């Protein structure tokens, strides 16, 4: 016997279904469910008097026979490929299936088998996303990693050795010894990690030894001298080893202008950091490279989005990060040349057009690593308010815009850095790095963070209380963040050459090493999902006005942002 219920009651019980719309936190962004993989009347739900009980929604199938380890029930998946309702299965630390969970002995349409060995995470009324990937990390202090994880970031790539002055300014881990010690420390942290070696050298030998020592990328930074010779050499070595190169170009234009840097690229693929320029790069026109087919451009989050306070905070921030002295006129001029309201405003619009492909933090070095996800959605909301719906959206929802923006901190950095076969999206066969959100807290405060199939972090109440919810509630590491579970549920990225050379044995690393691949000629701007636009970008050297395909790109700074103070009163 079947029974009809209202859509609102159904959504309360099992979460939204096809055609239902959901607001993302306090933004103006609205998503609409495109498809529901569950079966009406056969939904599975855990709890007293609910469906997932022996002989009902739970079968007798063993895990060895095909039952899954964990099922996230009735979740609303938001990913670059779609916005759909489904049950999500996890098995052996991987995403096993996306579909309909239950007991195939008595239920129709079951594609995910629940057995006695299956645990349940309730996803009803929740949004499920892939874990975030921050590809611009200054490893200044280990405490960063917990802050990033609690925000929903499960993968971090960058360079540094701790609070050295080289690390304060540059995302580079220099030399085999430092790389080895940093990689050994990574066994302590429940996230995927990768090291970028220093790429500033005019001859290949020093770069080769860093890659073979474990670097999964090389970073060219102006503070170490990003000359055309260093650029050319670094890209040549990267081509030989199939690793990515990230670049922070020459703000002072000492060794050449943006055209000289582009010439040194020789059409080769490169990841351009803070492409707008406030974080560093040829003044005032580094933003031009966002229109090139071989450049994979990203932003760092302090300029995201452009607000009434953005300019004021940047000058002091820059002086500290780059070891400058405000009493020296040349240092002050260097700082002021980088902070331009015109290019920061254009950055907002280039993100909305899909010309800027990725978002990152620049952690503690002109960036806030716990705010990559929040600032991505603040930018999307600001653009919705100022520019209206995108042409690809119907007007009733913002599905395409949401897919464009979520790709900026999930799948696109994974593609850029050669790890998209393992992470970056909610897809079958990938590592189960997943984040569950309540819609009202989307992009700000996750409900649960799953790493390699195991809950690794979550908000938790008083451990001495009789139930999990009494105040004070804090984000805390969970069992997946300890002991052997930690090292079994995350990886360290490196080059194939490092693995072939027996690096794990040499360093005694417990985490699995994962080789990056397809980072060079096999990818280009066209590989950046929903963010592959290549407009012709021009910058007026006198006014700093930015035009894309002849159109002036400008917008007002935001006076008020969503996902801000109302979420952080305590």
From Swiss-Prot:
Residues binding substrate: 221
Signal peptide range: none
Description of post-translational modifications: Carboxylation allows a single lysine to coordinate two nickel ions.
Compartments it resides in: Cytoplasm
Binding annotation for Ni(2+) 1: 136, 138, 219, 362
Pathway assigned in UniProt: Nitrogen metabolism; urea degradation; CO(2) and NH(3) from urea (urease route): step 1/1
Residues annotated as binding Ni(2+) 2: 219, 248, 274
A GO term from the CC aspect: cytoplasm
An MF annotation (GO) of this entry: urease activity
UniProt KW Calcium keyword: no
InterPro entries reported in the protein's UniProt record: Amidohydro-rel, Metal-dep_hydrolase_composite, Metal_Hydrolase, Urease_alpha_N_dom, Urease_alpha_subunit, Urease_AS, Urease_asu, Urease_asu_c
Reaction equation(s) it catalyzes: urea + 2 H2O + H(+) = hydrogencarbonate + 2 NH4(+)
Annotated protein name in UniProt: Urease subunit alpha
Organism of this sequence: Rhodopseudomonas palustris (strain BisA53)
Gene: ureC
């Amino acid at each position: 016997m079947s029974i009809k219920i209202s859509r609102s009651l159904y959504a309360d019980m099992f979460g939204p279904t096809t055609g239902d719309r959901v607001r993302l936190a306090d933004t103006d962004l609205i998503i609409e469910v495109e498809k529901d993989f569950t079966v009406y009347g056969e939904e599975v739900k855990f709890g007293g008097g609910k469906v997932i009980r022996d002989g009902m929604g739970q079968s007798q199938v063993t895990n060895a026979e095909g039952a899954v380890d964990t099922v996230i029930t009735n979740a609303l998946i938001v990913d670059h490929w779609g916005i759909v309702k489904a049950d999500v299965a996890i098995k052996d630390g991987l995403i096993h299936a996306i579909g309909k969970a239950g007991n195939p002995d008595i239920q129709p349409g079951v594609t995910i088998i629940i057995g006695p060995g299956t645990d349940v995470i309730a996803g009803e009324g929740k949004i499920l996303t892939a874990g975030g990937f921050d590809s611009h990390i200054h490893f200044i202090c280990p405490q960063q990693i917990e802050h990033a994880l609690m925000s929903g970031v499960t993968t971090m790539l960058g360079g540094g050795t701790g609070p050295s002055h080289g690390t304060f300014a540059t995302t580079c881990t220099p030399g085999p010894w430092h790389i080895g010690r940093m990689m050994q420390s990574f066994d302590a942290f429940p996230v995927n990690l990768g090291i970028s070696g220093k790429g500033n050298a005019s001859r290949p030998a020093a770069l080769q030894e860093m890659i073979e020592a474990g670097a999964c990328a090389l970073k060219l930074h102006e503070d170490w001298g990003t000359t055309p010779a260093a650029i050319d050499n670094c890209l040549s070595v990267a081509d030989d080893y199939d690793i990515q190169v990230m670049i922070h170009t020459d703000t002072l234009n000492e060794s050449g202008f943006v055209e000289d840097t582009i010439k040194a690229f020789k059409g080769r693929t490169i990841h351009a950091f803070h492409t707008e320029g406030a974080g560093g790069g040829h003044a005032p026109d580094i933003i031009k490279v966002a229109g090139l087919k071989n450049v994979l451009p990203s932003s760092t989050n302090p300029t995201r989005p452009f607000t009434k306070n953005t300019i004021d905070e940047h000058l002091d921030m820059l002086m500290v990060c780059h070891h400058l002295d405000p009493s020296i006129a040349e240092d002050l001029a260097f700082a002021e040349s980088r902070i331009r309201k015109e290019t920061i405003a254009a950055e907002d619009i280039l993100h909305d057009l899909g010309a800027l492909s990725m978002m990152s933090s620049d952690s503690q070095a002109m960036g806030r690593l716990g705010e990559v996800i929040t600032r991505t959605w603040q930018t999307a909301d600001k653009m919705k308010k100022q520019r209206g719906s995108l042409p690809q959206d119907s007007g009733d929802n913002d599905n395409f815009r949401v897919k464009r923006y979520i790709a900026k901190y999930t799948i696109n950095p994974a593609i850029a850095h050669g790890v998209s076969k393992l992470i970056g999206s909610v897809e079958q066969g990938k590592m189960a790095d997943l984040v569950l959100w309540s819609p009202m807290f989307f992009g700000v405060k996750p409900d649960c963070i799953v790493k390699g199939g195991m809950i690794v972090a979550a908000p938790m109440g008083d451990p001495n209380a009789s139930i999990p919810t009494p105040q004070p509630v804090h984000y805390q590491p969970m069992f997946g963040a300890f002991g052997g579970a930690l090292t079994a549920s995350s990886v360290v990225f490196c080059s194939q050459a490092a693995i072939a050379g027996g690096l794990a044995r040499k360093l005694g690393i417990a985490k699995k090493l994962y080789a990056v691949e397809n980072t060079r000629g096999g990818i280009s701007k066209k590989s950046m999902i929903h963010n592959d636009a290549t407009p012709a970008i021009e910058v007026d050297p006198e006014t700093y006005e930015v035009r894309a395909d002849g159109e002036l790109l400008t917008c007002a700074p935001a006076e008020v942002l969503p996902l801000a103070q109302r979420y952080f009163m305590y």
